[in-house]
A protein has these predicted regions:
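Conserved ABC ATPase "signature" region
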Residues: 75, 126-144, 253-254
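A short, proline-enriched helix->beta-strand linker immediately N-terminal to the Walker B motif
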Residues: 168-172
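Charged, flexible cofactor/metal-binding loops and thiol motifs
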Residues: 3-6, 24, 237-325
Length: 325
């Protein structure tokens, strides 16, 4: 009997609640995902749905409230700070804003060298300098920028610094937290192509967080759709775009600009109503109050996250009926 491949990273019923004045804000609520080695899982959803919190909780930059985070089969939620230090080099993050996420007082080489020095992997300055030069070359930063400062560079080069810093300790898993959203469109494609080239060359595994559906389609093997802290649909990238099953996913995809105005009117799915409060939400589908297809099964209990076709999961009791329309 063939053994099932152990994913590089897996979350099981992961939760992150923040204490607020009136209760608990459910930022990440019972999310179970898996990412195989060398693959990219895209995470999409509107602002405030919990995308960035999910990524940072997986890295334990934010401590989870409940659930498991398995990295190469080991639950890192049970690791002490000392034990986590060994995993930090294997799990890195590229932040959204390439300027605010780097120290403006440090030069390019000093920024990239910082994690190398902290890790203690290289002892001599010559070894560290050689590693920095290698990383700069890998991400397409000219050697003449070695002693430059962030304010002297454009957004694309600053983000390349962020990529080089994330790669400094040879990680296996990288959270890309909207790494191109703050960049000009002309630069976005360059950074996306760089990330994909690095994945091919180094065997990297990505959790790619974005609100741009055209970007996530370009880079992801699988896509998970989040709404108010919950994963409501997950499928291979092509399958999700060709056959979305959840009404919220359909609405998101209908918002993608198309050049044909007649096609735009045919595919429009307008979401009406107010977003449900994420503070101690009642059981049931959190999209139901805005959904034109809501039924009695949508209230009273959270919809089951079901596999409706191979690899295609959806949390909607109406999914089969909507699929045949």
């Amino acid at each position: 009997m063939e053994q099932k491949q152990v994913p590089l990273l897996e979350t099981r019923n992961l939760k992150k609640y923040f204490k607020v004045k009136n209760g608990f804000l459910h930022a990440v609520d019972d999310i179970s995902l898996r990412i195989d080695q060398g693959h990219t899982l895209g995470v999409v959803g509107e602002s405030g749905c919990g995308k960035s919190t999910l990524g940072r909780t997986i890295l334990r930059l934010i401590e989870p409230s409940a659930g498991e985070i398995l990295f190469q089969g080991k639950d890192i939620t049970k690791c002490s700070k000392k034990e986590m230090r060994a995993y930090r080099s294997q799990m890195q993050i590229i932040f959204q804003d390439p300027y605010s996420s780097i120290n403006p007082r440090l030069s390019v080489s000093e920024i990239i060298a910082e994690p190398i020095i902290v890790s203690g992997q290289y002892r001599s300055r010559a070894e560290i300098g050689k590693k920095v030069e290698q990383l700069m070359d890998t991400v397409g930063l000219a050697s003449r920028l070695y002693n430059a400062y962030p304010h002297e560079l454009d957004g694309g080069r600053r983000q390349r610094i962020g990529v080089a810093r994330a790669l400094a300790l040879d990680p296996k898993f990288v959270v890309c937290d909207e790494p191109v959203s703050a960049l000009d469109v002309s630069i976005q494609a360059q950074i996306l192509n760089l990330l994909m080239d690095l994945q091919d060359a180094l065997g990297l595994t990505y959790l790619f967080i974005t609100h741009d559906l055209s970007v996530v389609k370009h880079i992801s093997d699988e896509i998970a759709v989040l709404y108010l802290g919950q994963c409501i649909e997950k499928a291979p990238s092509r399958e999700l775009f060709a056959n979305p099953m959840h009404p919220y996913t359909k609405a998101l995809l209908s918002a993608i600009p198309v050049p044909d105005l007649s096609m735009r009117s045919k595919k429009a799915h307008i979401i009406r109503g107010e977003v449900t409060s994420p503070i101690d939400p009642k059981p049931g589908c959190r999209f139901a109050v805005r959904c034109e297809h809501a039924c009695p099964e949508c209230t009273g209990a959270d919809p089951a996250f079901r596999e409706l076709s191979p690899g295609h999961w959806c949390a909607c009791p109406m999914a089969e009926k909507l699929a045949v329309r």
